[in-house]
Regions:
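Juxta-kinase regulatory segment immediately upstream of eukaryotic protein kinase catalytic domains
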Residues: 1-28
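Exposed boundary/loop context
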Residues: 18, 27-30, 118, 152
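Short, structured coil/loop segments at alpha-helix boundaries
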Residues: 12, 16, 75-78, 113, ...
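ATP-binding pocket architecture of kinase catalytic cores
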Residues: 29-141
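Residues that form generic nucleotide/phosphate-binding pockets
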Residues: 18, 22, 109, 155, ...
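Active-site catalytic-loop/activation-segment of kinase and kinase-like phosphoryl-transfer enzymes
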Residues: 126-134, 141-163
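Solvent-exposed, flexible loop/coil residues
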Residues: 23, 105, 145
Length: 163
């Protein structure tokens, strides 16, 4: 297992002034492992309040955060997902605040129970079968190979791939 510190406690960052939900009283932790380009915070420890995640994207990453919000809204008809508490989009930024889903990540389970790899793979496979059982004709999003290859080329051209 990797010994990277997966998140770091941090102070509340400077937020968009339109993020008018009550975020006071939460402790903040910044995610250190994601590679989406977005800044991700876990908000926790506020009495009688749900754990939350705040994702912030700037520039082209703001488009990715916006796309995630749209897909979460659509996918919620098919499976339990985090609740979108707040979303803000400006020309340069996107802020997505969601509830956390209770439980542990596959990484956390594997750290706690190192011999559970086969069970984790089975659980992930079951989830993917459920996701893939959604009829393609119901999906309004384009993610075909032509789109993805053009997106990959653009990312390489813009120096966003660290190969």
């Amino acid at each position: 297992m990797s010994h990277i510190q997966r998140e770091t406690s941090c102070s509340r960052p400077r937020l968009n002034s339109n993020l008018d939900v009550d975020l006071y009283g939460y402790r903040w932790a910044r995610d250190n492992v994601g590679q989406s380009g977005a800044t991700i915070y876990r908000l926790y420890g506020k009495p009688d309040a749900p754990e939350l995640f705040l994702k912030h994207g700037k520039g082209s990453v703001a488009n990715d955060v916006t796309d995630e919000m749209v897909r979460l809204n659509w996918l919620t008809a098919f499976m339990p997902l985090p609740t979108i508490k707040h979303f803000i989009r400006t020309p340069d930024d996107a802020w997505l605040l969601t509830t956390a889903i209770p439980g542990k990540t596959a990484f956390q389970v594997l750290e706690e129970y190192p011999d559970s790899g086969e069970n984790i793979v089975d659980a992930l496979a079951a989830f993917l079968r459920r996701l893939h059982s959604i009829p393609v004709c119901n999906c309004p999003f384009n993610s075909d190979r032509v789109f993805r290859l053009a997106q990959a080329q653009s990312r390489m051209n813009n120096g966003l791939v660290d190969a």
